[in-house]
Amino acid sequence: GGSGQRMGQDIPKQFINVYDKPVIIYTLEGFQRHPQIDAIEVVCIDGWHDVLWAYAHQFNITKLKWVISGGNTGQESIRNGVFNLEGKVGDEDIIVIHDGIRPLVDETVLTDVIMKAQIHGNAVTSLPYNEQIFVVNPENEKTTKQYIPREILRRVSTPQAYKFGKLDWAYHEAFEKEVGIKGSAYTNTMMVELGETLYFAAGS
């Protein structure tokens, strides 16, 4: 549901053409091709729904079933997408969350995140963190006296996957209690703030 303001474009970033194809279509094709994906929902900026449907027809994205409006933040947009699925999917169904602006959907990563979510109830793609992380000294923000060993860090991104029942509960709970929904919060950080244990899947 992002608008691409950081990229200085009038057109939303996911609709920018790359080799005569919008970025969002490259993303959707990764899900369209995957045999374990049954249906696709896109949370989209108002005014671009018809454009997305037209592109989906043009590029044969037959698994696209729902296009709904986003919110003012990323978390509001995901919430809208989750709530729209109430009554449409079962509690044990696996919901994969992915950023439309990330077009390189690796099939093996998608397979692993789905498999781990089926076993554990959730899964987040992860990679080892190779940079050095230092903690800012609260007494002098230009200095540091502490670092975090990178061996205990993981860098996570999308796709992420959750069983729908838990995901739906989490978004109701988070927005009612205003937990894990502000700033740079995402589904994974929200889940941790709600006390859930997350499971790592393979990244790329």
Regions found by a protein language model. Name each.
Residues H57-D93:
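Short phosphate-binding loop-to-helix
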Residues F15, I24, G81, D99, ...:
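Residue-level signal for inorganic ion chemistry
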Residues L104-A201:
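Conserved core of the sugar-phosphate nucleotidyltransferase
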Residues G1-D50:
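N-terminal glycine-rich phosphate-binding loop and ensuing alpha1 helix
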Residues V18, V43, I68-S69, H98:
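Structural motif
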Residues L28-Q32, A56, L85:
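Hydrophobic C-terminal alpha-helix "anchor/cap" residues
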Residues E41-V42, I97, N122-T125:
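Structural beta-sheet core signal
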Residues D38-E41, W66, Y199:
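A structural signal for isolated positions on well-ordered beta-strands in alpha/beta enzyme cores
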